Design a protein with these regions (language model features):
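Acidic, Ser/Thr/Gly/Pro-rich intrinsically disordered interaction regions
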Residues: 5-178
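N-terminal ordered "arm"
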Residues: 1-2
C-alpha cells in the first residue's frame, strides 16, 4: 500500500489511534517482551462458576497489563485490528479486493478499458466480447467471476457484524434479438 494515494495519511491517523489505545500498546509491548526478551507474561488463572480464566501478569519489562482475562483481552484487541482492516477495505478496496478492482468504474478511474482488464487476468484482449455493446456489465461480471473477492468477510461479519459488499449479481443475459 506504500505509495498509494492517501495511504500514508490514513495509516498515520491509525497509528496515532493505536498509540493511545491501551490494548494496542500492551500487545505491542507484549510482542517485544516475549520475542526479544523472552519473558512470558502469563500471570495465572482461576476456576469458578465452571469457568477457567487466565490473566496476564505484570513484570518489570511489562508493568501495565490488562485487567480483563486473556481471552477477553485478545478478542478485544483482535476486534480492533479487524476494524482497522475493514476500514482499509472500505478506503482502498479496489487496490486489495479483486471484486472491487475489476469494475467498470474503477477501470475508468485508472484510465483503462475492459480489454486491459482481460489482459491483466491473462486472457486475450476481447475474450469476453460477444458483439453486444450493451453487454459490457456482463463482461465485467464474467471477469470478476474468475477472481476471488474479499476472503475475510466471514471475519468482518463475526467480529464487527459488517461485510464488504460485492457487486450485485446481474440478471441472466438476454440478447436484444431474442
Amino acid at each position: 500500500m506504500k505509495g498509494h494515494d492517501d495511504f500514508d495519511g490514513w495509516y498515520k491517523q491509525h497509528q496515532e489511534i493505536m498509540k493511545t489505545d491501551k490494548l494496542s500498546k500492551f500487545f505491542n509491548n507484549f510482542r517485544r517482551v516475549s520475542q526479544h526478551i523472552g519473558v512470558s507474561p502469563y500471570g495465572g488463572g482461576e476456576f469458578s462458576d465452571n469457568k477457567i480464566l487466565h490473566y496476564f501478569g505484570s513484570s518489570k519489562d511489562l508493568p501495565d497489563v490488562p485487567k480483563e482475562d486473556i481471552i477477553t483481552s485478545c478478542n478485544n484487541y483482535f476486534t480492533s485490528v479487524v476494524e482497522l482492516i475493514y476500514d482499509a477495505y472500505l478506503i482502498f478496496g479496489a487496490s486489495i479486493d479483486a471484486q472491487q478492482y475489476f469494475t467498470s468504474s474503477n477501470f475508468v478511474t485508472l484510465g483503462k478499458t475492459i480489454e486491459d482488464a482481460e489482459e491483466e487476468l491473462g486472457l486475450p484482449r476481447g475474450w469476453t466480447d460477444i458483439g453486444d455493446p450493451d453487454a459490457e456489465e456482463y463482461r465485467w461480471e464474467a471477469l470478476r467471476n474468475t477472481t476471488t473477492g474479499c476472503e475475510i468477510n466471514h471475519i468482518f461479519e463475526q467480529y464487527l457484524n459488517k461485510i464488504i459488499a460485492c457487486s450485485d449479481k446481474l440478471p441472466p443475459y438476454v440478447p436484444k434479438n431474442s
